[in-house]
Swiss-Prot record:
The gene is TIM8. Belongs to the small Tim family. This is Mitochondrial import inner membrane translocase subunit TIM8. Heterohexamer; composed of 3 copies of TIM8 and 3 copies of TIM13, named soluble 70 kDa complex. Associates with the TIM22 complex, whose core is composed of TIM22 and TIM54. Interacts with the transmembrane regions of multi-pass transmembrane proteins in transit. It comes from Gibberella zeae (strain ATCC MYA-4620 / CBS 123657 / FGSC 9075 / NRRL 31084 / PH-1). GO terms for molecular function: metal ion binding.
Length: 93
């Protein structure tokens, strides 16, 4: 998330003292991270739901096979995400 995306003018940023500028940068970084987590959660939900609940919903509760499939799907997604991050961190060092 850049300052331009938030319609923050550089002239406005220059009016801030160093402490406020640092706090604003941290806030923007936190918001970007939150946005990425929300997007990843949405993607995961959509992917696993499409895979595990392909038909119409007949009951207010998932049946056992759908529940198991969703749990496995989420676990595999998180495993792959963890391994990817571990690999990228290894490449960085």
């Amino acid at each position: 998330m850049s300052a331009q995306q938030l319609n923050i003018d550089n002239a406005d940023l220059e009016k801030l003292n160093d402490k406020d500028r640092t706090e604003l940068r941290q806030f923007l970084a936190n918001e970007q991270q939150r946005s990425q987590i929300q997007a990843q959660t949405h993607s995961l939900t959509q992917m696993c739901w499409s895979k595990c609940v392909p038909g119409t919903i007949k009951n207010p509760k998932l049946d056992k096979s759908e529940e198991t499939c969703l749990a496995n799907c989420v676990e595999r997604f998180l495993d792959v995400n963890y391994l990817t991050m571990k690999h990228l961190n290894g490449m960085r060092n």
